[in-house]
Amino acid sequence: MAHKKAGGSTRNGRDSESKRLGVKRFGGESVLAGNIIVRQRGTKFHAGNNVGIGKDHTLFALTEGKVKFEVKGPKNRKFVSIEAE
């Protein structure tokens, strides 16, 4: 004879794996060519000088130097560029 009633099922208990998005190299940090600067969905940050953009909108360094974040343009867009050291 069962001492516990049969447990009902729940419809919760699932979640997707985190995607580890965000800024990986901050302003003033030194980077080498190929280093990932920002992982993002869409273009929250835009590519400036010496920065490339991947098919998933990842921003990466094209040359070595220091990372620089700036806001410019009429729409106040955030740009990431690399300045030579």
Curated annotation (Swiss-Prot):
GO molecular function, one term: structural constituent of ribosome
GO (cellular component) term, any one: cytosolic large ribosomal subunit
GO biological-process terms attached to the record: translation
Record's keyword terms, sorted: Ribonucleoprotein, Ribosomal protein
Region: Disordered, residue numbers: 1-22
SUPFAM superfamilies membership: Ribosomal L27 protein-like
Source superkingdom: Bacteria
HAMAP family in alphabetical order: Ribosomal_bL27
Family per record: Belongs to the bacterial ribosomal protein bL27 family.
Protein name (Swiss-Prot/TrEMBL): Large ribosomal subunit protein bL27
Biological source species: Vibrio campbellii (strain ATCC BAA-1116)
Organism taxonomic ancestry: Bacteria, Pseudomonadati, Pseudomonadota, Gammaproteobacteria, Vibrionales
Gene: rpmA
